[in-house]
């Protein structure tokens, strides 16, 4: 009898724990290429005729509230993003979907869904799920498209500058060669001209009158 009562008590307690918690399932990983993602959170609870709150949190400890929406099945909830995020959402009887856009690599993190039953009492929320890692890839497409456009003009400019530099170099070499040749020719011409070492003195013989030897003949 005692064992039977204990078993009934444990069964009742387990049912109460299950009923007081909402189970939420999420995809373990989402890879984002276009800066936009939709995260679906499946819950195991009938939210019909209940006022509920659906929230999305960022971080291992759910420190940052990304987006939140309140509503019921009578009217669509209005989702409000937190600062630094852009979000919207919708829900049905099994799933709440959060749509995020304008994401960048800094938004890469783990995200958790939270479902709360606000009314009627008692208050219920979900057990923390395993979360979803959202990985936002860096965009390299724009660089890949613009690189060829910038590459060829740079090649043309570099080619023009190279040709101009070669032309200037060749011109300067020709001018320098001609100038050197002219200097060598002028130097050779100057070497062929006789040089006068200085004024020359004329040596004059002393004057002696000529003798007439015929006058002395007999």
From Swiss-Prot:
Residues 1-19 form the signal peptide. Residues 178-218 are cytoplasmic. One of its GO terms (molecular function) is identical protein binding. Residues 20-150 are extracellular. GO terms for biological process: apoptotic signaling pathway; CD4-positive, alpha-beta T cell proliferation; immune response; negative regulation of gene expression; negative thymic T cell selection; phosphatidylinositol 3-kinase/protein kinase B signal transduction; positive regulation of CD4-positive, alpha-beta T cell proliferation; positive regulation of gene expression. Phosphorylated by LCK. Dephosphorylated by PTPN11. Keywords: Cell membrane, Disulfide bond, Glycoprotein, Immunoglobulin domain, Membrane, Phosphoprotein, Receptor, Signal, Transmembrane, Transmembrane helix. Its main location: membrane. It comes from the Eukaryota. Glycans are attached at residues 72, 93, 106, 130. InterPro entries: CD28 (IPR008093), CTLA4/CD28 (IPR040216), Ig-like_dom_sf (IPR036179), Ig-like_fold (IPR013783), Ig_V-set (IPR013106). It is a single-pass type I membrane protein. Residues 29-138 form the Ig-like V-type domain. Pfam families: V-set_2 (PF15910). It is found in: Cell membrane. The modification Phosphotyrosine is found at residues 189, 207. GO terms for cellular component: cell surface; external side of plasma membrane; immunological synapse; plasma membrane; protein complex involved in cell adhesion. Receptor that plays a role in T-cell activation, proliferation, survival and the maintenance of immune homeostasis. Functions not only as an amplifier of TCR signals but delivers unique signals that control intracellular biochemical events that alter the gene expression program of T-cells. Stimulation upon engagement of its cognate ligands CD80 or CD86 increases proliferation and expression of various cytokines in particular IL2 production in both CD4(+) and CD8(+) T-cell subsets. Homodimer; disulfide-linked. Interacts with DUSP14. Binds to CD80/B7-1 and CD86/B7-2/B70. Interacts with GRB2. Interacts with PIK3R1. Interacts with PRKCQ. PANTHER family: CYTOTOXIC T-LYMPHOCYTE PROTEIN (PTHR11494), T-CELL-SPECIFIC SURFACE GLYCOPROTEIN CD28 (PTHR11494:SF7). This is T-cell-specific surface glycoprotein CD28. The gene is Cd28.
